[in-house]
Curated annotation (Swiss-Prot):
Signal peptide start and end residues: 1-27
Organism: Homo sapiens
GO cellular component: a single term: endoplasmic reticulum lumen
Pfam families referenced in this protein's UniProt entry, alphabetically: Thioredoxin, Thioredoxin_6, TXNDC16_2nd, TXNDC16_3rd, TXNDC16_N
Name the UniProt record assigns to this protein: Thioredoxin domain-containing protein 16
Start-end of Basic and acidic residues biased regions: 767-787
Cited Gene3D superfamilies: Glutaredoxin
Subunit field text: Interacts with FOXRED2.
Keyword set, alphabetical order: Disulfide bond, Endoplasmic reticulum, Glycoprotein, Secreted, Signal
Amino acid sequence: MFSGFNVFRVGISFVIMCIFYMPTVNSLPELSPQKYFSTLQPGKASLAYFCQADSPRTSVFLEELNEAVRPLQDYGISVAKVNCVKEEISRYCGKEKDLMKAYLFKGNILLREFPTDTLFDVNAIVAHVLFALLFSEVKYITNLEDLQNIENALKGKANIIFSYVRAIGIPEHRAVMEAAFVYGTTYQFVLTTEIALLESIGSEDVEYAHLYFFHCKLVLDLTQQCRRTLMEQPLTTLNIHLFIKTMKAPLLTEVAEDPQQVSTVHLQLGLPLVFIVSQQATYEADRRTAEWVAWRLLGKAGVLLLLRDSLEVNIPQDANVVFKRAEEGVPVEFLVLHDVDLIISHVENNMHIEEIQEDEDNDMEGPDIDVQDDEVAETVFRDRKRKLPLELTVELTEETFNATVMASDSIVLFYAGWQAVSMAFLQSYIDVAVKLKGTSTMLLTRINCADWSDVCTKQNVTEFPIIKMYKKGENPVSYAGMLGTEDLLKFIQLNRISYPVNITSIQEAEEYLSGELYKDLILYSSVSVLGLFSPTMKTAKEDFSEAGNYLKGYVITGIYSEEDVLLLSTKYAASLPALLLARHTEGKIESIPLASTHAQDIVQIITDALLEMFPEITVENLPSYFRLQKPLLILFSDGTVNPQYKKAILTLVKQKYLDSFTPCWLNLKNTPVGRGILRAYFDPLPPLPLLVLVNLHSGGQVFAFPSDQAIIEENLVLWLKKLEAGLENHITILPAQEWKPPLPAYDFLSMIDAATSQRGTRKVPKCMKETDVQENDKEQHEDKSAVRKEPIETLRIKHWNRSNWFKEAEKSFRRDKELGCSKVN
């Protein structure tokens, strides 16, 4: 059941497929046999039709095949028309009967032959091809005994999606196959075309297609039958998707808040909510009633148990049911219904189900629940026809991975073709390749873990997307920065040299601190860090080296430990061991003592030192400053900040007046979202520049510096003193809104954090043994294209915004160390 066709898997959005390999024109490629077979790739599926020449009896089929190009490519399946010529020797270009078939290949292995009369339209083509590829995910049965055997085998393990369609190849069959493509590794799909089987499970209206959800995972008693929920809407791809979403939602949820403010996945799907009002004295009976109602309304409405005793809002004393419609702005209804059937009837009589027209083939960009809920997936979908120069990167496979990373220093992008974040980051990765074209000594490569999951597992890839750098003689380095072009480019450029740099003379140290030694890298690291140690400080040097190894790709680090190190320490008033921080943009050098400081503390010190005193806030760097948990003192400017304002604020920073705040400025031209922020603070919007204090972490108050006063030191100090004394009035209070999951059962990040915290903290392990980054595969020369590789079900989506990137770097570094500190030979 859980092995599957893994060209692409869609985890975030189903209806809107986030697929990169989308042609700009939906046309059927025409190739020669030799050319066609040369394009086949291991693990990739391809449908081909061989013909001598167009004839009246094949022209209709070719039209339908042309229509199937786009939907099949959505699933990573290529389609081609192969023109046979007399000189060509091929078993597929031989007899007339061979020319009346289409052939499905996976790699160079023939999987199925389809007579063209069974591929009568685009629905039949898509349905048959997916059916052939999903042979493990979809069980075809003909009798009740087979269904009972599958049901018994999966009790307590997994749920079943059972479908009846009138015939193979019709639109309903295609819809089921498309659902199986997405959910086949989560649920066991069972299909039948036998009316007798449908009748035997008690179905009515057997002339129509049916789809049931068998709730077998909850069944622990093998003698108990699995509950069954019938999908009452027509069998379309979208309806099946929405139905499965409701099956995944919690059956019953307890709430203790205003029903008008409650939102669940049901409302997002256009379904109403039913609140069963409970109180402490009748809680158990009310919960049993609510569960019974929930089973009756499963797939039709969401059911919640509303705890009256915990509510701050008033509910009429006699009301025992609250009904909330899916339409926005409609007030909730307070009802008195003492019979379960009355509750069911009220819901069914008041449901407003909007008909959704599906257009499988036209390139519509209508609203989709998942996509509208996920801006990354939506962006990838809208950019799906953007042609990227993929040839600037090398695509790796199981056969080529080892040889490539051992032959040259390589950057490897591990991604999943079905995942929106991966596909968005792939665009940034290609943009980096464009910038580095012809200048980088690093080989930029990529591997699709949806196709080559074994490789990704061996490389300890446990989340998507992830970048790893492989250098000969060094441990693999994982990139843990922002998933954008500039940050990744900085990471690659700074990794051109090894860290920490070993400085061998006073003159070289001065050149290092001035930026002359590595002036081509100063563009990517405005701060250079030099560790000063006496030759006998072995432990301190080891800790610093470990910290520098952590931070490589993010900051330039060097170490000086010669006999004359006291000359440098005296010059810069630094007591050994110490750090010298050279801020190149400001032309100043600071010293920080390192007495009894461990590697992780050094990482923290350097990370904090990278923060600017008066930074320009951008979308990329906001998390770094937001994590400081201080009120933000923001100067909003419509362009470059006035030098006088900057000087005044920096003076207060140096005089320690602003230690309790995070002073920063925001350029509305560079970061247009700032205008939306100001509109939330002011009505109407006053003229710029504007100095605002935002207390995000405590209370949400927003204070504005008086616009009739000049932004000078004296006025700022007076204003801050008034704020401290409580003499200034806030202009607004930001609502305490959080981006919460729709229901507690969807709070996956807290579950992950809880599991992580239980493991306890560990010190950074040291490398005890060196092993090769790759093991020799004795089966290297076997035909692996026929092997159905399992998708990595445990892979987690990488957090999109890293608020504390050095901690993520630490995790990645630990994982690579725990692999045995493997090195590329």
